[in-house]
Amino acid sequence: MSESERYSFLILHDEIDLADLTKYCESDGKTRLDYSDDVARRKWGKKWRIPTDEEWTELRENCTWEWRGNGYKVSSNKNGKSIFLPAAGWRFLDWSRINAPEHGWYWSSSLDTENPKKAWQESIGLEGECHYAWVWLPGTEKVERCSGDRYFGCSIRPVTE
């Protein structure tokens, strides 16, 4: 079995052991994505990247979040600028789309140092518990920081330097 086949099998059966990780784990001490692994940077160029856990926390704590039917308008309490974060749900191993348009999950570039199999996310949505990443919970106006398995198909909201 090739390494990629082995990894796919382990992911499919949720049998990844921390010892199977060779990057972003205890042995290499990395706590943030390298630029070479950042999909925003690879797709849109050097100025773009996935935001850190600290940047998501800043957004969550210093902005007004207004539900717009299929996502949030997030407005800065400091300068009034805003962005829109759609409730795009997330994708699982079989590529099924889950919880759209009630929830949104957004990756940060920061790993959960307590569990290297996971990274920090922001969760937004209508109801329920935060199991993955950064999540918003519209209707309850709930935005949470969560830790989720790195192989889940969550959205990204790139930022520029």
Residue spans for each PLM region:
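Conserved positions within compact, well-structured domain cores
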Residues: M1-E161
